[in-house]
């Protein structure tokens, strides 16, 4: 809603994909939000413009906030690491010290079905994205032309039923309604880990060789089997990052704060602030409170 789109398309992945920025300060994040926000007549998703004066002269929250947090996994059979939990606990301890009301709750949904719907959208959108290339070159793309998962999504997208795609979009909206009912009616913000565990090693295999063979042959299967294989292919990566797609699909703003470092690997672990639509200013104000009290952990060269 708040980011410029077009001119080749205004509903990128039905609103589930939008550009962002990796920033090293809350000031820079607020500046990015301020300068990038816009209203476009052609854009189907609209968000009201935030107050630029408040963004440029950001202050800590002027009132005590009521913040929910959860140490539960959003997806069954995907556990959270102790580092992920410790990052949230550290943030919770700080928030309580600052006088905010912090309440532990269960994660409001089991997002297993939602991620399957997300893959269905990925498949249909990938097919739509690559179809012009196939028409221009008068041939179908094959597994030698593009990366394997993209090829798998392309083949599944060609068989995706229209009804399945519509049902997927409906489920996104129903999930947003659940968040409203279980969180936003009672709390200002929601706090979770950013990821379930620290990042994988560069080059760490996330798809088995046996599964890769199945993906190469994906065009030979029906849509149901195709989606089962695609879900299996994404499962290892989902074990690292089971949160972020949820806010993407529901349209809720989210902000990751680098507050913790894993003792064993010395890799960063973030906590993620979630807010209801148009709550970016509140999120940035709270992020500033973390920053002003030296809770954000940054590399030394950013601090000198």
Model regions: which residues?
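Short, gly/Ser/Thr-rich active-site loops of penicillin-recognizing serine hydrolases
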Residues: 163, 283-304
């Amino acid at each position: 809603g708040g980011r410029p789109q077009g001119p080749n398309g205004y509903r990128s992945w039905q609103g589930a994909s939008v550009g962002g920025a990796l920033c090293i300060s809350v000031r820079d994040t607020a500046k990015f939000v301020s300068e990038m926000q816009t209203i476009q007549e052609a854009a189907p998703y609209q968000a009201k413009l935030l107050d630029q004066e408040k963004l440029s002269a950001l202050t800590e929250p002027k009132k005590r906030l009521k913040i929910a947090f959860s140490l539960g996994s959003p997806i069954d059979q995907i556990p959270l690491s102790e580092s992920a939990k410790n990052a949230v606990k550290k943030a919770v301890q700080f928030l309580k010290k600052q006088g905010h009301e912090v309440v532990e709750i269960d994660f409001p949904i089991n997002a297993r079905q939602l991620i399957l719907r997300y893959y269905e959208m990925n498949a249909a959108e990938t097919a739509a994205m690559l179809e012009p290339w196939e028409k221009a070159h008068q041939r179908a793309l094959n597994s030698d032309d593009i990366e394997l998962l993209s090829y798998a999504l392309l083949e599944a997208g060609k068989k995706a039923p229209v009804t399945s795609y519509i049902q997927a979009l409906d489920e996104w909206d129903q999930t947003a309604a659940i968040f409203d009912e279980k969180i936003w009616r009672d709390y200002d913000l929601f706090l979770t880990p950013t990821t379930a565990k620290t990042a994988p090693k560069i080059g760490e295999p996330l798809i088995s060789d046996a599964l890769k063979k199945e993906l190469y042959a994906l065009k030979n299967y029906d849509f149901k089997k195709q989606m089962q294989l695609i879900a299996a292919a994404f499962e290892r990566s989902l074990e690292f990052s089971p949160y972020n797609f949820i806010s993407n699909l529901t349209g809720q703003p989210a902000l990751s704060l680098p507050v913790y470092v894993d003792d064993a690997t010395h890799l960063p672990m973030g906590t993620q602030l979630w807010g209801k639509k148009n709550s970016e200013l509140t999120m940035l104000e709270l992020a500033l409170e973390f920053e002003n009290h030296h809770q954000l952990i940054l590399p030394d060269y950013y601090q000198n």
